[in-house]
Amino acid sequence: MNQARGFTLIELMVVIMLIAAAYVLVPRYLFSGVSGADLKASSRDIAAGLRMARAEAVNTRRDTSLTLDMEKRTFTINGAQTRKLPELLEMKLVTAQSEVVNQSQASIRFFPDGSSTGGRVTVASGERKYEVDVDWLTGRVTIAQ
């Protein structure tokens, strides 16, 4: 008798299931963290918040602060508008010592003339990072990769 060689339907289904499981699970372990697009969007959100705080200080002729909470991954402008950032985002803020609230919270303050306390917010995920700089003299906000 001549038997046909090949795979059974069950064997093929098992292989397909294993491939599907690998397709779903492997990217989580290889690419954990924030995507490049989310990282860039987060840096732009922070920059926009800083620019909004500066504009508010100039328009209202009152000091305005943007406060970052590195633990909760949020920032607020004068304690009113809270914006949430991705959980896996790594954040670091360098600012004037007078603006440090505690270990996880600090602010960048803008003055009515447009100047600020200055600082740098670094948002990162793994090796990728963006730096949002605030010039203390002019209050100008820039993003660098």
Please provide the spans of the model-predicted regions.
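N-terminal leader/signal peptides at the extreme start of proteins
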Residues: M1-F7
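N-terminal helix-rich module
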Residues: N2, M13, A21, L25-R51, ...
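Residues within the helices of the helix-turn-helix
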Residues: I10
